[in-house]
A protein has these predicted regions:
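SAM cofactor-binding core of SAM-dependent methyltransferases
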Residues: 4-55
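Conserved Rossmann-like nucleotide-cofactor binding loop
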Residues: 35, 198, 282
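Class I S-adenosyl-L-methionine
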Residues: 56-68, 75-239, 243-247
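Short pre-catalytic strand/loop immediately N-terminal to key active-site residues, enriched for Gly-Thr
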Residues: 269-275
Length: 297
């Protein structure tokens, strides 16, 4: 199998393929971030780097040999957490570059499979992307999958693909305490980590805005069971400010949230590790989707 990965990052797609027993004959990676690319080369030295996706028409690629193309196109323009400018933003324009490349591959090899990924977004954006993807590429199956089914992180993502037979992953029952190096947490699933996680967070934004997962020392947080008027069990958060300490998730813990092997991103600064992990795929979700490829069955 020959694979073309757009916006490859630290090559979560190769990790996913490896986990389902697929070793590509050729793996082309389009990525401009030098730190993410260095992690890819450290772990997968046979990767063929292509550089920036906007230079795709200069690439030395035999398009007819590409069997799979994967693209997690930039989310900042489409995300509910961003400016929501869609393709009016320069990064949003990369959606059209993505479609152009996939269309070019399918013209050269109609049997090629594709997988596109982006954040859960407002309905109008999702419908816009789905419509234009269908217009450009033909039959498209759309799936909304939460990484919480395979990891300890709430991370809802849309996937558009021509791979058939995809169902929701089975819930592995992984909770946040399972992946911590130390400390305790007040919830079962982490907030979605993003590329800005390295900036840290504070208690106010964590509890009021549900942002940037924090971990507490054992004597810093206690749970008090409570029941609402409907009899549903809920949790009150009680903080002992005097004795409380809190911290960010470690890079290792973020690797585990993304179902990346421990230590995979070692070799760059923690800032860069957080950034690439926040930008990356949840590996086990991609592995679940790609396990439906005919070459794998």
């Amino acid at each position: 199998m020959n694979v073309l990965s757009l916006f490859d990052g630290m090559s979560c797609t190769q990790l996913a393929l490896k986990s389902i027993g697929v070793r590509p004959n050729k793996y082309y990676a389009a990525e401009w971030d030098k730190y993410a690319s260095s992690i890819t080369q450290k772990n997968f030295p046979d990767t063929i780097p292509l550089g920036d996706v906007t230079d795709w028409f200069h690439w030395d690629v035999d398009w007819s040999t590409i069997d799979l193309i994967v693209a997690g196109f930039p989310c900042q323009s489409w995300s509910m957490a961003g400016a929501r400018l869609g393709d009016r933003d320069a990064r949003g324009q990369l959606f059209w570059v993505t479609l152009d490349i996939i269309q070019h591959v399918l013209e050269a090899n109609p049997n090629a499979k594709f997988l596109m990924e982006n954040v859960k977004m407002k309905a109008a954006f999702e419908q816009y992307i789905t419509h234009h993807t269908q217009e450009a590429l033909g039959v498209v199956n759309k799936h909304l999958i939460n990484s919480a089914l395979v990891s300890a992180q709430n991370r809802q993502r849309y996937y558009w693909t021509n791979i058939e037979g995809i169902e929701q992953p089975k819930d592995k029952g992984v909770v946040l305490k399972d992946i911590l190096e130390n400390g305790v947490t007040d919830r079962e699933k982490a907030h979605c980590i993003d590329a800005n996680y390295f900036k840290g967070g504070n208690l106010k934004s964590y509890f009021e805005k549900h942002r940037r997962q924090l971990v507490f020392s054992p004597n810093g947080l206690c749970h008090v069971g409570d029941a609402d008027l409907n009899g549903n069990q809920s949790i009150k958060r009680v903080l002992d400010v005097k004795d409380m300490t809190w911290r960010k998730l470690t890079p290792l813990e973020c690797e585990r949230l993304q179902t990346v092997p421990d230590g995979y991103t070692e070799g760059v600064s923690n800032t860069q590790r957080y950034k690439m992990l926040g930008n990356g795929f949840t590996v086990d979700v991609i592995a679940h989707i790609l396990s439906n490829l005919e070459q794998v069955k």
